[in-house]
Structures are given as C-alpha cells and as structure tokens.
C-alpha cells in the first residue's frame, strides 16, 4: 500500500441553491401579512446578496426568512458575510451580504495548524483557494476530517476528491 491517498478541503456555496432559496423566500415574503405593501426584495448579484426593505426591523425579518430557506436548501450560512445597513432610494434600507467562495490565507493557516496539531503522518498544501491533504493511511485522513469538523472555523468547509 505504497500509494498515497488524498482529499481536498474546499469552501464553496452552491449558487443554484442560493437562487432557489431566494425565490422561495420572495414567494413567502409576498404572501406574508406583515410584509403587505412593503418594498422588500432579495437579489443575487454575482457573488453578493442584496437585501432591501422599508426599515431595519423588516430587513432583519427578511434576513431571518432568507436564512431559514438557505438552511432548508442545505446552504451553509457561515459563508455569508453581512455588510452595514445603509439607506437606499425611496426611503428604504439596503444591506449587502458577500458569499464567501474559497479558503483565504488566514483560514488556510488555521486549518493547517489544526492538521499539524493532530500529530498524524499527513501532508497538507495550500493550492489557491483549497487545501490538499495527503497521507499513506486512509484512517489518518479520516481522523483529520473529524478534527477539522470539530474545529470552530469561521467558514463552512467541504471535503472533496477523496482518493
């Protein structure tokens, strides 16, 4: 068993599921009594959500509805970074939320320290926005996956290309 096994650690958001969640949330917003006559809207612009509503209270309710729909669709809400609430045209307020795709340098360092702290015989290398972990023992790789899942990371990670 000289062949090395490996897997990749990635952080991705499925934009199709986000679009579906937005559509379902907007359908609910249009039928809810407390949003009747409201100028509430959720849109997706490239990798950024734009939430618009009449006031901050309704914006928070809009956000709660969206988060509920995202969770039901299996989209990680950890990968959404909300910006400041800013005034928009027509007496409304707007909030932008960035969808985080990929693992940045800081989070890659955190993940690497978690891997190193396990003391297992595995190698990890940062490749652009993902981390490749390789080792001879598949059991060691499984233990690394378990250690990363237990860690409290600021982003949601997925494990792909397990060979």
From Swiss-Prot:
One GO cellular component assignment for this chain's record is:
cytosol
Q: Give the top-rank taxon of the lineage listed in the UniProt record for this protein.
A: Bacteria
Can you provide one Gene Ontology molecular function annotated for this UniProt record?
A: nucleotide binding
> What CDD domains would the database entry show?
YajQ_like
| Membrane-crossing residue ranges in chain numbering | none
Q: List the disulfide bonds.
A: none
A Pfam family matched by this chain, by name?
DUF520
What keywords does the record list, in alphabetical order? Nucleotide-binding
Q: Which family does it belong to?
A: Belongs to the YajQ family.
Q: What does this protein do?
A: Nucleotide-binding protein.
Tell me the protein's name.
Answer: Nucleotide-binding protein GTNG_0630
Q: Which organism is it from?
A: Geobacillus thermodenitrificans (strain NG80-2)
Q: What is the lineage of its organism?
A: Bacteria, Bacillati, Bacillota, Bacilli, Bacillales
